[in-house]
């Protein structure tokens, strides 16, 4: 039995959002094909994550070093650690998010800030950063209305690249990326683009 963490970073209605459609398509297909696995759903917008600020940084540093922290710092560190330990405990992780304004929703950035902890997800060495998160499988579900896979917009894509860069820094190697794109750029083909993409999502979930 695997512990599987489903992370959704979009609070739009399913009728309005392709990345939310992808999330639910993957979730339902995975449930049907992996009835023995333990699934945890994490809706980042519903969590109302505080920004990773000076209080949280000081709290994580002090508690990690066994130093005295203020009550506010202790509370902030406990909140960060809750999400960090949940992530580390998962065997498989599903991340669903849109490309908004060429990057990720702010709540996902905050969540990734929580996870970027030296000594937990990576460590510093004289040769550079070394990832500490190994043995996990991750699938990225991303939707973007324009075409960012090629052409002049490819260099502007800072959503999937941002998430992938962090995962790789943490040592995660087994990453599958499923992207639906161009449905706003090519409205006459939108229905076909989305449906074809969702079929791939469904199949990928069965084999995840």
Which stretches of residues belong to each language-model region?
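Short histidine/acidic/glycine/proline-rich micro-motifs that form metal-
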Residues: 11-14, 146-147, 184-185
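A short helix->loop->beta-strand "cap" motif at the edges of active sites that frequently abuts
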Residues: 2, 35, 135-136, 172
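Substrate-gripping "pore-loop 1 plus following alpha2 helix"
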Residues: 118-124
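N-terminal beta1-alpha1-beta2 submodule of the flavodoxin-like/Rossmannoid cofactor-binding fold
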Residues: 1-97, 102-113, 117, 199-208
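Short, glycine-/small-residue-rich phosphate/pyrophosphate-handling segment
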Residues: 124-169
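Glycine-rich phosphate/pyrophosphate-binding loop and the adjoining helix
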Residues: 28, 150-208
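Cofactor-binding loop segments of dinucleotide-utilizing enzymes, especially the Rossmann-like FAD-
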Residues: 9, 143, 180
């Amino acid at each position: 039995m695997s512990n599987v963490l489903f992370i959704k970073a979009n609070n739009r209605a399913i009728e309005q959002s392709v990345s939310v459609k992808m999330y639910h398509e993957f979730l339902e297909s995975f449930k049907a094909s992996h009835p023995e696995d333990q699934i945890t759903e994490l809706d980042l917008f519903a969590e109302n994550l505080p920004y990773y600020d000076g209080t949280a940084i000081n709290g994580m540093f002090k508690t990690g070093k066994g130093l005295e922290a203020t009550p506010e710092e202790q509370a902030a560190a406990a909140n960060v650690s809750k999400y960090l330990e949940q992530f580390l405990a998962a065997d498989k992780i599903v991340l669903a998010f849109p490309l908004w304004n060429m990057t990720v929703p702010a709540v996902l950035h905050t969540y990734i800030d929580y996870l970027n902890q030296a000594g937990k997800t990576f460590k510093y060495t004289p040769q550079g950063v070394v990832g500490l998160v190994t043995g996990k499988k991750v699938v990225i579900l991303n939707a973007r209305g324009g075409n960012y896979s090629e052409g002049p917009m490819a260099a502007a894509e800072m959503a999937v690249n941002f998430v992938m860069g962090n995962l790789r820094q943490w040592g995660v190697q087994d990453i599958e990326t499923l992207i639906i794109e161009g449905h706003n750029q090519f409205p006459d083909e939108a229905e076909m683009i989305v449906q074809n993409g969702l079929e791939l999502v469904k199949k990928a979930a069965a084999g995840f």
